[in-house]
Amino acid sequence: MARTQRNTDRERTRITDDNGVAIESALVGDGLELSYPSSDGPVVECTRLDIPEEAVTALVGPNGSGKSTLLKALSSHLEPDTGTVRIHGENLDSFSQKELARELGVLSQENDSLGSISVEDLVYHGRYPHRGFFDGTDEADHRAVERAIELAGIDEIRDTELGQLSGGQKQLAWIAMVLAQDTDVLLLDEPTTFLDVHHQFRVLETIRQLNEEKGVTVAVILHDIAQAARFADYLVAMHDGELYDWGPPEEVVTEQLLADVFGIEAVVEYEPELQVLPKRALPDR
Amino acid sequence: MAEAESVGGYAATEQRDSWVTGTLVLFCLASTVVTVVAGLIQVSFGEYSMTFLQAWKAVFNPTVIFDLNAWVSFLFGTERPDMSTNSIVVWNLRLPRVFVGIITGATLAVSGAIFQAVTRNELASPFILGVSSGAGFAVLATLVVFSGLAPFLPLIAALGGTLAFGVVYAIAWKGGTSPVRLVLAGVIVNMVFQSLQQGLFFFADDLGVVQTAIAWITGSLTGTGWEEVRIAILPALISIGIALAGARQLNVLMLGENTARSLGMRVERVRFFLSGVAILAASVAIAVAGVVSFFGLVVPHIVRNTVGGDYRRLMVGCVFAGPALMVTADVGARLAMGGTQMPVGVVTGLIGGPYFLYLMRKQQSMGEL
C-alpha cells in the first residue's frame, strides 16, 4: 500500500509505493488560483495538486469547497488566473482541444437532458475526438464503443432512447460515452450523486474495473466521504477553496478532518477496514 | 469468445451505417411526390390556358429536357434555342417559379434546423436571430431611399441579414456566447429592425414601392424566373452540402456545451461557422423570395416529429420536406384566390402558425429538442 512521506514544512508531500519508489503523477496542478468572472477574488487557491498515475483519486469536501472548480481547471474548462496544469508533464495549453480530448475524458456534473437519442448513438459521440470532420466510423471506433458498453454493462439498453431511462441508467450511458473516448485519464464530477445504491455501486465498480484492467488514472468527485474512503486509493480533501489534506484514505480520514472539513462528529474505525460512521452535525456551522 | 465478440462487432458495423431508417426513406419519397404533384399543378394553370395534358407533355418534353443548349440558356442566361409556345410558357415562365420554391424551401428549412441546434432552442429560426428582419430592413431601405441600387437587391438582402446576425452575435458575446443570450439579443435586434422598417414606410411616397416592399417583407415567389434560380442555386447547394456534412457536429453540439468541449470540439468556432452556413442558406432564400415567415421555424419541427431528433436524418428530411411544403404553399398563394396572387409568406404564416400550435398541443415533449 502506498504511503506518504511528509516534509518537515508539510508543504509538499511525495507519494511512494512500498519500495520507496516515487509514483508519477498523471495530472499536476501547480500554484493554481481559480476564479469565475462573476466572483470577486479567487474561489480556489492551491499550491500543488497531484493526481497519481494509474490510481483512483477521490476529491471530497463539503458543498462550495471548490471541488468542481478545481476539476474544471484540471480539464481546461476553466482558465486558471495563475498557475499551470500539466498532464503527463506537458502543459494543458500546448494541446489542441481534440488532442486533449484524446488524453483526458471529462464527465460534467450536469448533463443536459437530451431525450431523443439512443444510448448507442450517445456512446458513439465519445469517438468524436478520434474522427475528422468528414470521417465515418471505423473498426477502432466500433471496438471502443463495444468495449465501453460492455464495461458499463448497458448492453441491454443500447437501443433505448435516453429519455426513457432512469437516472442511474442515464448516468451509466454517459459514463460509457466517456469510456469510448479511450483516454488515459478520466475526470468525473459527482457521478454517483442522485443515484440509488445499486447504481452507485455499478458506477463505482465500472470505474474500478477500468482502473485495474486498463491502468486508467481516475479523479472523481464524490459526495459521500464514507464511500470515498472505502473506494479510492487517494483522497484529496478540500475546505474553503483550499487543500486541507491529501494522501491514502487511512491517513487522511480522521475524526479531526470530519469535524474540520465536514462539520460532523463521526467515529472512524480502521480495523478490519476503514469505516466512517457519522454521528451528528456539529452545532457551530 | 473473442470470435463471437468480433462477429457482434461487425453486425454493429452494418447497423451503424444504416442510420437511414425506413421512416426517413418513406418521408423523403412522400415529400418528393408532393413536390412533383404540386409542381405539376402549378405549371398547368395560368393566363395562357393549356390543358393538363398539354402542360405535362411540355414539362416532360424530351427535346427540352435532353437539350444541352436549353439548359445552358436557363442556367447561364444565354440565348434560348427555339421551342414551341407551350414549352416556352412552361419552361420559361412557370417551371422556374417551382424551382425557386424548391430552393427556398430547402434552404429555409436547413437554415432553421441549424439555428435550432446551434442555439439549442426550439424557437430559433432565421427570424428570431435577426437575419430576416435585418434583410427586410436592408431591402426596404434600398427600395425607399437608395432606389438606384435596386438591381443588387438580393445581395443587399443577404448583407443586411449578415449584418443583423453579426450585431446579435456581438451583443450576445461575453467571453463566449450562450443559447439564451443569443435568442434574447436576437429578439431585441429584431424589434429594433422592425421599428426601423415601419418607420421607413412613412418615407415611401409611391404606392407601387410600398407594395413591392410588402411583397419582399412577407415573402413572395411572384414573378421569379431563371434569373432567380441562377442567383440562388450555387450558394444553396454549397450551404446544403455543408449542412449535411456538419450534421454530426450539430448532434454533438446538442449534447450541451460542456460535453461538446470535453469531447474536443472548439464550440465557439463550430457554432460560428455553422451559423454562417445557416445565414448563407437563409440569405439565399431571402434574396430571391423575400422573408417567408414561419417556414424556417416550423419545417424542422415537422420533420423532427416524423424522423426523430438525429440531425443526420433531420437534415436530409428538411432538404426534402422544405421544397414540398414551399411549392405546395406557393400553389395556394398563386391559385387559391383566383385572379390575384398572394405572397407565399401569407400562406405559410396562415398554415404554419396553426399547425405549430397543433403540434404544441399534441406533443407532450415539445419543449425538448
Question: What does each of the following model-derived ranges do?
Answer:
Chain A
Residues 11-29, 33-53, 58, 91-96:
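A short, flexible loop at the N-terminus of ABC-type nucleotide-binding domains that lies
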Residues 60-62:
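The feature captures the beta-strand-to-loop junction immediately N-terminal to the Walker
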Residues 75:
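Helix-to-loop junction immediately C-terminal to a conserved catalytic motif
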Residues 186-190:
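Catalytic Walker B motif of ABC-type/P-loop ATPase nucleotide-binding domains
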Residues 124, 139-157:
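Conserved ABC ATPase "signature" region
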Residues 259-285:
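ABC ATPase nucleotide-binding domains
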